[in-house]
Design a protein with these regions (language model features):
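Residues lining hydrophobic/aromatic ligand-binding pockets adjacent to catalytic sites
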Residues: 1-198
């Protein structure tokens, strides 16, 4: 992520296109807050010869067989259907999911484009041209900052976490470390203001 001159809003977001798929990472997962608490969802991937080790992230295929997509969309509707902005934004996300891109990279790219636009983040989206350190100044490298198996909320650890209203916060209190759709469905157009004052 390349930060703007004010070092607050990214002017560009780069996705790492030259890594191999990392098992048990956020690349095919998301976390939402439902009526029973945090829910972790995984998008199943196609295993080549019984494995996915060493497969470039841009070549990894999604396994669209089975019932998981219907269950995932149902979970989103249950978790956020009563949120203030669900009806305004959900169709865009549902359309991406229903398009069933064959590769995980394409799904993640479509979701990131949609999220940046919906959140009102004025940033260009691109992909890396090689693996390694970026020589550009003002780059915030977050490739290893987040992992579902580490229970550290990156924002909270850096003193940046700030609660916002969540549908189930009366039951669970504020729950950090969730997908950006949680912020979007609950805060809507105010999401960009929330992000700017982190």
């Amino acid at each position: 992520m390349v930060l703007s001159r004010d070092r607050v809003v990214p002017s560009a977001v780069y996705l790492e296109a030259f890594e191999n798929y990392q098992k048990q990472s956020w690349r095919n997962r998301c976390r939402i807050l439902g009526p029973r608490g945090r829910e972790d969802w995984s998008f199943p991937i196609v295993h080549r010869n019984g494995s996915h080790n060493g497969i470039p992230i841009t070549e990894l295929e999604i396994d669209w067989s089975g019932d998981w997509l219907r269950r995932f969309k149902g979970a989103l509707e249950t978790a956020y259907g009563s949120s203030a902005f669900f009806e305004y934004y959900y169709d865009g996300l549902r359309d991406i999911l229903d398009s069933r891109p064959s590769r995980l990279w394409d799904l993640n790219l479509l979701c990131m484009e949609w999220l940046l636009s919906a959140l009102g983040v004025p940033a260009e989206l691109g992909s890396s041209i090689s693996y390694g350190r970026c020589p550009v100044e003002n780059v915030l490298d977050l490739r290893t900052a987040f992992h579902p198996k580490r229970e550290n909320d990156y924002l909270a650890c850096h003193g940046l976490g700030r609660p916002y209203f969540q549908v189930f916060s009366p039951r669970f209190g504020f729950t950090g470390g969730l997908s950006a759709v949680d912020l979007l469905f609950n805060e809507g157009p105010a999401s960009i203001t929330y992000l700017k004052i982190l």
